[in-house]
Amino acid sequence: MLTDPAEEAFLPNFLLLGAGTALVLCLVFFLYQKLDQSQFAVIKLGIWGSAVGLLMDTISLWNLPLIFPALSKGQVIAFTIWMVCAYCMYLLIPLILSHKK
């Protein structure tokens, strides 16, 4: 799935990966909303989840040769692009779900 952004297959793969990420995040937030019905529960999860995830991704990118030794530079760029978009969704989806209430 991690295709070099310079390749022609990058955009379709990226859109498919992004759609899958959005679906999984919607499901996670929907289930969490059923478990914790307090006000702003999903927003708190989005903020804390993003903070923890960004820290973990920072460490993984910092130690790239140890954690992802087989990735090319293009794949690392593709991973970083997906990661930024995923965290954007991780912050926006809870706002959308909270607004619908």
Curated annotation (Swiss-Prot):
Does Electron transport show up as a keyword for this record?
no
Instruction: Please give the Pfam families that the UniProt record associates with this protein.
Output: DUF5367
Q: What keywords are annotated for this sequence in UniProt?
A: Cell membrane, Membrane, Transmembrane, Transmembrane helix
Q: Which GO terms describe its cellular component?
A: plasma membrane
- Please state the protein's primary subcellular location: membrane
Which stretches are transmembrane? 10-32, 45-67, 77-99
Q: What is its subcellular localisation?
A: Cell membrane
Give the way it sits in the membrane: Multi-pass membrane protein
Superkingdom of the organism of origin:
Bacteria
InterPro entries, per the entry: Uncharacterised_YnzE
Its recorded name reads Uncharacterized protein YnzE
